[in-house]
Amino acid sequence: MSTNIEQLKEDSNEDEYYLGTSKKHHKIKYPTSYRVLVFTTIISCLISIFLLYKFYKIYNSSNFLNLSEARFSVREYSQKQIEPEKINALLRVAQLSPTAANKQPQKIYIITKEEDKQKLKIVTRYTFDAPMFFLVCCDKNKAWKHKTEDYYSTEIDGSIVATNIILEAHDLGLGSVIVRSFQTQKLKELFKLPENIVPIVLLPIGYPKENTKPSENHFKRKDIKDMVEYL
């Protein structure tokens, strides 16, 4: 009798897992070491999955080469409105763009009004009916100037800013294309731009139309050996 009582006490001190729903259950007893092993294995797997996910996100979000290969000039746009947060992201990369001596002479005019779009059509035929345009300019008074030559960094600084914008646009699912074929002086007159503001490029921006594809010419790239020469 005493032996049975002692056995019952030992059973009550152990964790028990029951299978089935009938009154007569089947007892499966797992030692503590086994349960700890299972628990730590599960935690390790979850941590590994989390780290792999983070690595995947970091790698794919920062793979500049893939982004450069995937981007192409878009010349057909839908009229879907661009979300404010995406516009802000484009402006943020424009703000972060490198400029000569960090003078930051960039000035961006955002064109969305229909009357202003009609003005653009007067100075260029390359508007592609985009819902929005970034007119990337530089302030000549703020740009870096060469000490001994009559040279300002406006063109280069503005081009760097524009490049960053079109790459970010593609990363956000938007499309863009660089337009430089416009009447500079006429554009300045129509938009009443100050004399010190130098228009660099016009960027149509928007969601590409469905099934928009890069032109065949986009894939024609010079061989690197024809582009590079070691001195």
How does the language model describe each region?
Residues 2-231:
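Acidic, surface-exposed loops and disordered segments
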